[in-house]
Structure formats: C-alpha cells, structure tokens
Amino acid sequence: MDRGTVGSAQSGRLLVEVRQEGTSAVVTPAGELDHHTADLLREPLEDCLEKGFSRLVVDCSRLEFCDSTGLNVLLSARLKAESAGGGVHLVGMQPVVARVFEITGADAVFTVHDTLDAALAE
C-alpha cells in the first residue's frame, strides 16, 4: 500500500510549470523530485533547450525534496545550457533541498539566487 512516503510512486507528486520571462525560460517544479518523478522535470527542461532557451531559471521555492536523480537532471540541463552559451540558475531553494546541493558540492557549479527577480535581473 502506498502511504505517500518519500520514494514511493504516486502520480501528481511533481508538477512542473514553464513560462517565458524575457530571454529566460522559468521552470517551476512543485513537489518531490526523485527517481520516480525525474522525467517530469527532465522533459520540460530539454524542451526549453530545444526551443532555443539557453538560460534556464529553475524556481525551487515549491520543491519539497530532491534526491540524487533529481540533482542529475539539473546537472545534465546545466551542461546542455552551458554548451549553448547559457546556464541554469536556481532560485529560492528550501533548506532541505539546499542541503542536498551543499553536501554534494553541486551548489558550487550552479548560480543560486535568493529571489526570482534577482535571477531574472542577472
């Protein structure tokens, strides 16, 4: 029985919104990013890159959890965006998500902003 525990397969655990802000694509994942839901973020990120957006702003303010699979999705998008002359900017990480980036050292390879306005102004 699925009790909605971390790591369990449950539809609707991650919702992703995408919108354009100037020359940036703003991608907002809401919920849990893990091995069950990673493709729900990977596909919109790749779609943005295919549409010519090399500057991706990922608004993490509604992201409740991120495991190593989710981190790899973001790292892959970063490499693709940088090879196209852009990058991936992370915004508003919750402490539990920021800790994953801190522990793995991934916070050193992403540009991290406190607010969406700050990310879009850069």
Model segments located where?
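STAS-typified acidic loop motif
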Residues: A9-E43
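N-terminal non-cleavable signal-anchor helices
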Residues: G7, V27-T28, E50, F101
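Short acidic low-complexity segments
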Residues: H113-T115
